[in-house]
Amino acid sequence: MAREKDLAVAFRSTVVAPGLIVELAKRLDSLSCLSHVFVPEGSQGGFTSIDICSACLAISKRLRIGSGIIRILEHDPGLLARRLLTLQQLSDNRFVLGIGTGRAGSDPKLTIRAMLDRLRLTRESFETFTEALPGVEMPETFIRTLRKGIAKAVIGHSDGILLNFCSPEHVRDVISSLGDARRRLIVSCYLKIFYSKDEATANRMLIEEFAGYDQNPSYHKMFESVGIAQEIGRANLFLRSGKSVRPSENLKRISLANPTKRELASYVTMFREAGVDLPCLYPYFEPSEDAVFKIGKVEEIARM
């Protein structure tokens, strides 16, 4: 279970190169306020999260490090269980399994049931392997969710839920739907922060992220519920016309661009007060930004 002031960070390998993620895990391992590192897997293929996590676990001693998320329906449960077994044995049970459905398809409920069934089969295979290996534990498991229905469906199947790119109000709404079961779940949430040496570039990246998520019906509905859907559309139109755009206060309740230390601390506190147990700072950079800049910003947010 997450401690009261635990903090996580997330690194996507298309934003922070795998070798640099490993270097950051080594640097951050000594920071007691940081408990978890998540490595989200790209939706378009490329580097695999579990392999990057394996390298990070090998050079660290304390941090819990894991996928955040993998699409478990793409994995054979027996083979995945063996990989988890190996990681847990080698890392003293520090691997974290973050999973999701990927594209929900035409029947989201059916896809969610398939995901939970795949997790069950993986766990059963894992437990079969560990009968002769006392002390090796099934990884702490997080399931990515956005809507209340998914959050309620995963109760009893995971240690926590992982929310993404949402407002504190939405977090409260999801948590309130869980009732008494909320006490059995760690609630984590990705808090995306966009950094650049150029302020306009950081703002542009943030608006583009909002515009991209707004194309997803589930996120569009969530944006509508907190009154920012039209605002996102207007900001994106301004951006596409070549005009510079600064994020409004409403958008900054969900994501930040080049925040000051005070702004970042206030942002994290806002989500903790909404009920998030494990805020997960998720820095984004332009591909052209140098490694020194990225390392400096990551160390800055991890020490906030």
Predicted regions span which residues?
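Glycine-rich, proline-tolerant flexible connector loops at the mouths of alpha/beta enzymes
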Residues: 35-59, 71, 103-110, 165-168, ...
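N-terminal beta1-alpha1-beta2 module of alpha/beta enzyme domains
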Residues: 1-60
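An alpha-helical appendage that flanks or caps ligand/catalytic pockets
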Residues: 112-132, 137, 172, 176-274
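Active-site mouth loops of central-metabolism enzymes
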Residues: 5-20, 68-78, 137-145, 193-196, ...
